[in-house]
């Protein structure tokens, strides 16, 4: 069994572009892209129609490697979730005066397929 092919920076950026268009078409507005801090990075920070901040992790996999290794969604491990939560806390502390409702979503791109997992994990991860 071969390991999944590594995702290049270009593939990752293309996946993020695709995820952004997908979410915007569903009414979300971009707040920030590729927010980086010492604790980690958030691919997309969006605001939904109700005003909640949505921290989005985009995971892309090439089609031929997805099924054997659990697909893109399976790559958001508990350790990755903790890094995303730390980055979100940093974002909120630096960028937001009044903290709105927040959630963590995952966009999994497996080849041509996009899956949007709303509220994929919480801060107790």
UniProtKB/Swiss-Prot annotation:
Q: Which superkingdom heads the taxonomic lineage of this protein's source?
A: Bacteria
- CDD domains assigned: PoNe_Nuclease (cd20736)
What Pfam families does this protein's entry cite?
A: UPF0102
Q: Which GO terms describe its molecular function?
A: nucleic acid binding
Q: Which InterPro entries match?
A: Restrct_endonuc-II-like, tRNA_endonuc-like_dom_sf, UPF0102_YraN-like
Fetch the Gene3D superfamilies from UniProt. 3.40.1350.10
Q: Which SUPFAM superfamilies match?
A: Restriction endonuclease-like
Q: Which family does it belong to?
A: Belongs to the UPF0102 family.
- NCBIfam families given in the database record: PRK12497.1-3 (NF009150), YraN family protein (TIGR00252)
**Name recorded for this polypeptide:** UPF0102 protein Rpic_3463
Instruction: Give the source species.
Output: Ralstonia pickettii (strain 12J)
